[in-house]
């Protein structure tokens, strides 16, 4: 938490999606850090210690979003992690969620209101 606001790290190799997430999350009252790669996301995680992380499943580096989640765990992450996916059926996504210890997986295009509800719940907020 910085300046009384929760900090959310968003990691996606699509700049348009990152900007949309940043704008929507800022409007909802959250501070955001963004990263265009898994490697940059890991660096920003170490620098900022965010309260929650949102990452894309399909990124080029560190074996995509799942690799990032594994690297975050090795770096001591205890923040909730939400994964964004444009691939896979619910069974595959469900298996990945259990295996990686993810807090939630959202299919693209993301229903932002549903994601916001999950973010609030994971951060222990009401509303």
Predicted regions and their residues:
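Hydrophobic/aromatic residues positioned on beta-strands within the core alpha/beta folds
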Residues: 84-85
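Non-catalytic signal-transmission and effector/linker regions of two-component phosphorelay proteins
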Residues: 1-7, 113-127
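Conserved phosphotransfer cores of two-component systems
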Residues: 46-48, 71-78, 100
């Amino acid at each position: 938490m910085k300046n009384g606001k929760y900090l959310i790290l968003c990691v996606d190799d699509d700049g348009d999606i990152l900007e949309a997430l940043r704008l929507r999350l800022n409007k909802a009252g959250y501070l955001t850090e963004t990263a265009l790669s898994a490697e940059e996301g890991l660096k920003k995680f170490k620098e900022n210690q965010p309260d929650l992380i949102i990452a894309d499943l399909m990124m080029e580096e560190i074996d995509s979003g799942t690799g990032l989640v594994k690297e975050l765990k090795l770096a001591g992450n205890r923040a909730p992690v939400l994964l964004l996916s444009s691939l896979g059926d619910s069974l595959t996504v469900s298996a990945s969620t259990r295996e990686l210890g993810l807090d939630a997986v959202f299919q693209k295009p993301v229903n932002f209101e549903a994601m916001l509800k999950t973010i609030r719940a994971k951060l222990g907020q009401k509303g």
